[in-house]
Amino acid sequence: MKFVGAHVSAAGGVDQAVIRAHELEATAFALFTKNQRQWRAAPLAEDVIEKFKLTCEKYGYTSAQILPHDSYLINLGHPVTEALEKSREAFIDELVRCQQLGLSLLNFHPGSHLLQIDEDQCLARIAESINIALDATEGVTAVIENTAGQGSNLGFKFEHLAAIIEKVEDKSRVGVCIDTCHAFAAGYDLRTEEDCEHTFAALGKIVGFQYLRGMHLNDAKSEFNSRVDRHHSLGEGNIGKTVFSYIMRDSRFDNIPLILETVNMDIWAEEIAWLKSQTEIEPSL
């Protein structure tokens, strides 16, 4: 089964994200459990936690259909010890919040070396950060997102994701989320069925589909291999609609959140309906 939705606002309370997803007729959704541009947030109150869980139950969302995202401020590969510790503490707090809400996944960007340490050192720091955070929490899987490779961000190569996973001690609690815009901007072509076959074969070989825990379905304003992260609405960017139809028809992408982060939220309901319609098309041979 395909779980399709969008990254919805949690303004007014995390339970409001559930309602917004339901209004889109989404079968999945993403959210921030706190203000993503602040380091600290008040702990989740018991009534807030209970309201979120009851609203999920009311509208039929399980933890397998929900892909929360952590704060953009966190850098688990930070080259400066003090800043790294701050990021690690914040990441643990994000995992705890997910744990309290009954969520099983936490999506995050791996980290940046800021031109101060080399890639391998940064990847090792990211893995160490994940190990520390997983040791301090339970029940939530750390889901590493591929990046476009802007600036000094790592995670733009599938090999980066594989290198991090290799160093994570509890393999049962680590996974990946593949963003189509990021992949395209990082040099993984997705414009034709043949391109999709090639790119996802590489993902399977280098990372392994057993680690795929979610997808971000975004077209790209940015050019192929530009290392620039600019999302667009489905079919309106440089990738086109082929890959999104491909994903909806391929069972390797079943039972994970497939999340829109496209630029026009006014057409999310239409985009979700179109994605759902693609499951009825026979797969290409």
Swiss-Prot record:
GO MF entries: deoxyribonuclease IV (phage-T4-induced) activity; DNA binding; DNA-(apurinic or apyrimidinic site) endonuclease activity; phosphoric diester hydrolase activity; zinc ion binding
Binding site for Zn(2+) 1: 69, 109, 145
Protein name: Probable endonuclease 4
Entry cofactors: Zn(2+)
Function: Endonuclease IV plays a role in DNA repair. It cleaves phosphodiester bonds at apurinic or apyrimidinic (AP) sites, generating a 3'-hydroxyl group and a 5'-terminal sugar phosphate.
Binding-site positions, Zn(2+) 2: 145, 179, 216, 261
Catalytic activities: Endonucleolytic cleavage to 5'-phosphooligonucleotide end-products
Matching NCBIfam families: nfo, PRK01060.1-4
Pfam families: AP_endonuc_2
EC nos: 3.1.21.2
